[in-house]
């Protein structure tokens, strides 16, 4: 029976160590036997900001290179992509790619996404995000690999495989989505909808050095020493949350996934290959997940005024169509 989650030790970002760990973590999941020559694989990385690899905010290039080499050996073409906050254009992404060490991945044979087209879709099967706009380069993929970074997160408690899909929303649109889904539960539901819509074929977590404290960008690097993988973003998140001393109840995206039957509530119910207990970080400094994303939660006047103004500006509102409106007032 195939494992739900595979976890192996990876003590550093040494190239040989990364290659060994990558091969070892994928084996219990069937390896990369599903990859065939000519496939176009998009690796959805975490490039949250223009930060250096040693700052532990982004997926490390050495691990990416190990995966790229394995995929190229099977005849696949590989594209790396993400949409960090800010302008979704060549100038900004080039800056992020350079800072995060992605040129190393380019040298290993991967293309760095430079397609900045966008697409808006209806998603009738969603629980929350029934309509959203995303980065259309993903449409070219025969399969998506979600390669996330394990970090603390001020709103979601933890950012990992599911939260990584917020990177499909074009950068300048992200504040709009925060205001469209101001409550943590709604925002988490939106993230789960995105993860289900894009249905990654494989999810891998860089937990060699994670981030604790004021994540996802202003925290402190924390060595965990693990590489983890799963076919399920939700099950991977459940196992990784346990590493940080969290349960499904502590992470809004996991609560949403459990409610939808996408993963068990308890990590003990996962089929795990590897010793999860070897990677527990009992003193991990995690921020308390916030109930909303709005600023001014401490009640200060300027915060409340700014909050009110931004809510009025960004919150979606119905726009009646005079020719078809029947005056039912449901909107």
Residue locations for each model-derived region?
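N-terminal and secondary-structure boundary signal
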Residues: 1-326
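Cys/His-coordinated zinc-binding microdomains
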Residues: 329
């Amino acid at each position: 029976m195939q494992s739900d989650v595979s976890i192996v030790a990876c003590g550093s970002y040494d190239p040989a160590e990364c290659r060994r760990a990558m091969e070892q973590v994928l084996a219990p999941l069937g390896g990369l036997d599903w990859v065939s020559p000519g496939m176009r694989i998009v690796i959805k990385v975490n490039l949250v900001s223009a930060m250096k690899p040693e700052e532990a905010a982004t997926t490390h290039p050495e691990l990416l290179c190990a995966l790229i080499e394995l995929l190229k050996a099977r005849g696949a073409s590989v594209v790396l992509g993400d949409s960090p906050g800010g302008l979704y254009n060549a100038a900004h992404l080039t800056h992020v790619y350079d800072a995060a060490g992605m040129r190393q991945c380019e040298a290993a044979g991967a293309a760095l996404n430079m397609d900045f087209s966008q697409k808006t879709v209806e998603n009738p099967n969603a629980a929350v995000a029934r309509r959203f706009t995303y980065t259309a380069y993903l449409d070219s993929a025969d399969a998506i690999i979600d390669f996330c970074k394990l970090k603390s997160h001020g709103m979601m408690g933890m950012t990992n495989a599911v939260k990584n899909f917020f990177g499909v929303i074009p950068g300048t649109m992200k504040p709009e989505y925060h205001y469209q889904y101001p409550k943590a539960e709604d925002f988490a539901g939106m993230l789960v909808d995105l993860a289900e819509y894009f249905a990654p074929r494989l999810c891998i977590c860089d937990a060699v050095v994670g981030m604790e404290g004021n994540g996802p960008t202003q925290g402190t690097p924390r060595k965990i020493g693990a590489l983890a993988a799963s076919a399920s973003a939700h099950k991977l998140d459940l196992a990784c949350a346990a590493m940080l001393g969290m349960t499904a109840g502590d992470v809004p995206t996991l609560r949403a996934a459990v409610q939808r039957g996408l993963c068990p509530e308890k990590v003990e119910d996962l089929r795990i290959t590897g010793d999860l207990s070897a990677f527990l970080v009992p003193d991990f400094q995690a921020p308390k997940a916030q109930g909303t994303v709005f600023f001014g939660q401490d009640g200060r006047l300027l915060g409340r005024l700014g909050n009110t103004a931004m809510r009025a500006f960004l919150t979606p509102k119905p726009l009646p169509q005079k020719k078809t409106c029947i005056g039912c007032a449901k909107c």
